[in-house]
């Protein structure tokens, strides 16, 4: 037993010595050895200690992103926005062969039949059909709202969780899909109001709000209150206002928040009033109606919030 232990310790010492020698330059005995791409090089004298002759890159060359996409022979990465995560193939709808020539009538009919069967076998059961329809709805609404790809991914993940937890039972697929998209916008900090989401949805606002609260509670989603300042860049861009107005609007919101005026107020309405007040203070005047149309709030809301903000800034009414 003791002999085996001594032999093991001896092997460990020899291995450690070998590693130290591998990390040391044989030319100048420097330990300043780095790995640069496929080579181990001494930084002091420049000696190449070890190199890898295998090129792990592609055999083709590309000089811009379009050429790289055209020559690449791998598929797109997996995505949660498709019910099969993008792993299945699809038959093209262009009815052309590999050389770009149009197919004859017999071949076109054959390809149409193959497409139909392929669509049928892609969804094996009711759960997959449910998921396919819901994710297509999320993609449609996300495109209409102009939100980034990350929001679609998050919304798809939330819907998959809701489906797994059987939260869809007794509720419409459109309602849960819309609620998941709204929750994803909130989580990712992409300012979209419930009214804006309702405009692109196929259900009413009351059902969206009710389903959103249910899904958020059942899945324990961590969603922070919307910051009115998140709306400012979009409102200012639509109204063609300068960065000075945005900065002033941020100052107005911060001052109002310090005095507790944000509690119970609509974030979009508060942001719209701040933009209106800032445009007046910076001599880039916009009417209440123009701001209300962009922010999708009423002029009464802007007037009420504007009065509160001006008093908070100490300018009087």
Curated annotation (Swiss-Prot):
Transmembrane segments: none
Chain positions of all zinc fingers (TFIIB-type): 21-50
Bias-annotated ranges (Basic and acidic residues): 1-14
Keywords (A to Z) from UniProt: Metal-binding, Plasmid, Repeat, Transcription, Transcription regulation, Zinc, Zinc-finger
Positions annotated as Sequence repeat: 136-219, 230-311
A Pfam entry, by short name: TFIIB
Cellular component terms (Gene Ontology): transcription preinitiation complex
CDD domains (UniProt xref): CYCLIN_TFIIB_archaea_like_rpt1, CYCLIN_TFIIB_archaea_like_rpt2
Annotated binding of Zn(2+), by residue: 25, 28, 42, 45
Region: Disordered, residue numbers: 1-25, 62-83
Molecular function via GO: DNA-binding transcription factor activity; TBP-class protein binding; zinc ion binding
GO biological process: DNA-templated transcription initiation; transcription preinitiation complex assembly
InterPro entries xrefs: Cyclin-like_dom (IPR013763), Cyclin-like_sf (IPR036915), TFIIB (IPR000812), TFIIB_arc (IPR023484), TFIIB_CS (IPR023486), TFIIB_cyclin (IPR013150), Znf_TFIIB (IPR013137)
Matches recorded under SUPFAM superfamilies: Cyclin-like, Zinc beta-ribbon
Family listed: Belongs to the TFIIB family.
Purpose: Stabilizes TBP binding to an archaeal box-A promoter. Also responsible for recruiting RNA polymerase II to the pre-initiation complex (DNA-TBP-TFIIB).
NCBIfam families in UniProt: PRK00423.1 (NF001658)
Protein's name according to its UniProt entry: Transcription initiation factor IIB 3
Native source organism of the sequence: Halobacterium salinarum (strain ATCC 700922 / JCM 11081 / NRC-1)
């Amino acid at each position: 037993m003791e002999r085996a232990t001594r032999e093991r310790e001896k092997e460990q010492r020899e291995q450690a010595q070998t590693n130290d020698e591998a990390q040391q330059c044989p030319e100048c005995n420097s330990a300043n050895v780095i790995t640069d791409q496929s080579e181990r090089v001494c930084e002091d004298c420049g000696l190449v200690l070890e190199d890898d002759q295998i090129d792990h890159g592609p055999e083709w060359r590309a000089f811009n992103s379009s050429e790289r996409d055209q020559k690449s022979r791998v598929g797109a990465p997996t995505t949660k926005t498709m019910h099969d995560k993008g792993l299945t193939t699809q038959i093209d709808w262009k009815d052309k062969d590999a050389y770009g020539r149009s197919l004859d009538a017999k071949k076109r009919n054959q390809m149409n039949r193959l497409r139909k069967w392929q669509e049928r076998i892609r969804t094996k059961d009711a759960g997959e059909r449910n998921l396919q329809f819901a994710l297509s709805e999320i993609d449609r609404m996300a495109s209409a709202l102009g939100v980034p790809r990350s929001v679609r991914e998050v919304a798809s993940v939330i819907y998959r969780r809701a489906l797994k937890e059987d939260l869809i039972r007794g509720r419409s697929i459109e309602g849960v899909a819309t609620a998941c998209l709204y929750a994803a916008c909130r989580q990712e900090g992409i300012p979209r109001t419930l009214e804006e989401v309702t405009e692109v949805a196929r259900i009413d606002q009351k059902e969206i709000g009710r389903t959103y609260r249910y899904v958020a509670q059942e899945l324990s989603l961590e969603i922070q209150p919307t910051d009115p300042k998140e709306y400012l860049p979009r409102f200012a861009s639509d109204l063609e206002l300068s960065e000075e107005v945005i900065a002033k609007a941020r100052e107005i919101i911060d001052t109002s928040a310090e005095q507790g005026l944000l509690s119970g107020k609509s974030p979009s309405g508060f942001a719209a009033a701040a933009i209106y007040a800032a445009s007046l203070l910076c001599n880039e005047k916009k009417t209440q109606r123009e701001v209300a149309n962009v922010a999708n709030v009423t002029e009464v809301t802007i007037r009420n919030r504007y009065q509160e903000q001006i008093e908070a800034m100490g300018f009087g009414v």
